[in-house]
């Protein structure tokens, strides 16, 4: 079985080695056909504490790492402008 992947935005980095990633899922309503947007928040493992709030990241499914963590950061797709200023 293939591992699931999601792309989302980091919304919290206040925990050690953990970030909260918000993934937006868009789909048409079954009756009204209006595009509905649902946001799901995943806790993901960030071993190096490299992610900052606003970063676009790809997360992959992994074994359970704690009570709520079942995802890990695969790669940082783009950094937020705030994160780039802090690293310089």
From Swiss-Prot:
InterPro entries: NA-bd_OB-fold (IPR012340), Ribosomal_uS17 (IPR000266), Ribosomal_uS17_bact/chlr (IPR019984), Ribosomal_uS17_CS (IPR019979). GO terms for cellular component: cytosolic small ribosomal subunit. Transmembrane segments: none annotated. Pfam families: Ribosomal_S17 (PF00366). Keywords: Ribonucleoprotein, Ribosomal protein, RNA-binding, rRNA-binding. The keyword Ribonucleoprotein applies. GO terms for molecular function: rRNA binding; structural constituent of ribosome. GO terms for biological process: translation. One of the primary rRNA binding proteins, it binds specifically to the 5'-end of 16S ribosomal RNA. Belongs to the universal ribosomal protein uS17 family. Part of the 30S ribosomal subunit. This is Small ribosomal subunit protein uS17. It comes from Synechococcus sp. (strain CC9311).
